[in-house]
Amino acid sequence: IVAMGSICDVAEEVIDYLTAHGEKVGLVKVRLYRPFVTEKFVAALPETVKKIAVLDRTKEPGSIGEPLYMDVVNALSVEGREGVTVIGGRYGLGSKDTPPSSVFAVYSELEKDAPRRQFTIGIVDDVTNLSLPEVPAPNTAAPGTIECKFWGLGGDGTVGANKNSIKIIGDHTDKYVQAYFQYDSKKTGGVTISHLRFGDSPIRSPYYVNKADFVACHNPSYITKDFPIVRDVKPGGALLINCQWTPEELEEHLSAAAKRYIAENDIKLYLINAIDLAIEIGMGKRTNTILQSAFFTLAKVMPQEEAIQYMKDAATKSYAKKGADIVDMNHKAIDAGATAFVQVDVPEAWKTAEAAPKTSDIDGRPETVALVTNVMEPVARMDGDSLPVSAFVGYEDGQFPLGASAYEKRGVAVSVPEWNPD
């Protein structure tokens, strides 16, 4: 592979995995793009190279190839290097994630006797049919890396708490740390996803966490909406759900697919009612401190007493200017969160849970119903990145049917106002 930018770190991870399994693969990182020195580039290529895939993070409509691809082809021609097959691919357009599975797909394509000259990765392109088929990839992260994922609501403090958590782990242990944060366009009141990694080896994973050792859902509506939260958990991992439900009530809200996944993959399931606890302590809607404390207890990154003390020190530093009452409230929340969760015994019957038949009750103009069904509903379920290109046929110029916002009822509030006319 010849590439530049963050995909090089992903490729390195995959190369380490493949070479350990006897494959002969490699990577040339382009660090200085202009001037493009052809003799230096060709000198960096081993004599044994037979095939090259050049990855560009851009699209040149009307061109016979993207810029880096054209430079590589030209460099080989100018320097007289023959017998090398060169193909070009695009990745990362529209902020698409590029996980290891995409890099595995590129090397699989190169193994073919006649690889396609142009391709894309990271999206299912069933219109021009340029995308490479991807299969679930093995975990290529450094051994011992712990991966965590937190689903929060914009404004609930989840992102801030996770920034504090990663600082505590990085400052007070010998572990390497990494954090990425995803937001939707709504900011406050929208979905936030925090991706945390920490481990004893350097972390070269510039992509989102796909399968996590620990997953926390900080808003119960995400469970009823059947967000892909449960399938984020690795087999044997832990799932913490913040809700006001009892274990019996939780069973009513989990989908059949979620129940089967939890039971079949030995997921440790925990419930915590940080919503009522925060109100009781006086924190209002801010559940982040309670949930952060529960995370440190369950994740066992460091001794519990140390983690609690470091969280209290951070809270004191953050809220000292707001007065002793605010600091004390946060300290109470930290102490409460460390023990407020309960483990749920997963019934054996969940392994055979069956989904109730779905009924569509969408009514309206045919073009609006088609948009809602094919685009808006998957996006609302946080499955938008899995949509194929064909889902957008008919909307190429950016025009959408009017009146579609009426179908977006998010229902993320824990409480709703009651009007009192008196």
Predicted regions and their residues:
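Short, surface-exposed amphipathic charged segments that create phosphate/polyanion-binding patches used
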Residues: 43-47, 98-108, 284-288
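C-terminal non-catalytic interaction/assembly regions of soluble proteins
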Residues: 19, 26-96
